[in-house]
Amino acid sequence: MAAAGREKGYVTQTAAALDKSPSLSPQLAAPIRGRPKKCLVYPHAPKSSRLSRSVLRWLQGLDLSFFPRNINRDFSNGFLIAEIFCIYYPWELELSSFENGTSLKVKLGNWAQLEKFLARKKFKLPKELIHGTIHCKAGVPEILIEEVYTLLTHREIKSIQDDFVNFTDYSYQMRLPLVSRSTVSKSIKDNIRLSELLSNPNMLTNELKAEFLILLHMLQRKLGRKLNPEWFDVKPTVGEVTLNHLPAQASGRRYNLKVKRGRVVPVLPNIGSGGSSHREIHVKQAGQHSYYSAMKPIRNMDKKP
């Protein structure tokens, strides 16, 4: 009897403990949730890209091994371009022969294989675009991707580039304030990459590039002085001041009157039928300080007896 009473007391204590514990009761009462449904997640568009929406949708639908976050960096080695061509031509190009690296040797090797494939398929990609993509020139990879899109889909797209790409940062520098623009040395360092010097160590070619950048910087400075004369304290010349103060219509009328007066030459009427002689007439033309003599036959006014 005593043992049975002890067992009943132990059962009642454990039941009371379970009722009092707040952490166990909600876990037992909560229903078991199923696995979350998988939703289709599209990769985000690359930051500050100048690709059109149709090209971005096309890249998202290709299911690439990784989506490009930085257009200039991710397309420079040619691995993603090779993967795109492998999707369209799986039996003619093997992705295993390409390497996803950042060294100059890897980039040149991948693009050399791509150039052979393009020549075999008679696809034409400008070498300037390939060169600019390898060396991460601003705005060049976007044009290359649009060319590849046109070759593979046979669709024409309207480029959204602001201006023509000249493989320099000239357009970017012109949009900056005058204080923030780079100097000549900084412009040369920014536009001639180290990879260009390593791939083409010809000193003459690099000197010509540097001279071109210096001339471009001088042109940029002259244009800045013309557009912002107050900043550079450029004083107008005497001719500019005169043209600014004179009205356009009045100055044009005065000039026409001067020209007309200078060109008028008096001619004597014919009198009688006597002998003729010659007389010098000095005429002053507008805009000239020299006189010239014109020989005019004039009949003699004296009558013969």
UniProtKB/Swiss-Prot annotation:
Gene Ontology cellular-component terms for this entry are: axoneme; cytosol; nucleoplasm
Calponin-homology (CH) domain: from which residue to which, for each copy? Answer: 49-155
- Pfam families noted in UniProt: CH_2
**Localization terms from the record:** Nucleus
Q: Which UniProt keywords apply?
A: Nucleus
Which terms in the Gene Ontology molecular function aspect does this entry carry? Answer: microtubule binding
Q: Name one GO biological process term.
A: regulation of cytoskeleton organization
Q: What does this protein do?
A: May play a role in apoptosis regulation.
Q: What name has this protein been given in UniProt?
A: Spermatogenesis-associated protein 4
From what organism does this protein derive?
Pan troglodytes
Native organism taxonomy: Eukaryota, Metazoa, Chordata, Craniata, Vertebrata
Gene giving rise to this polypeptide? SPATA4
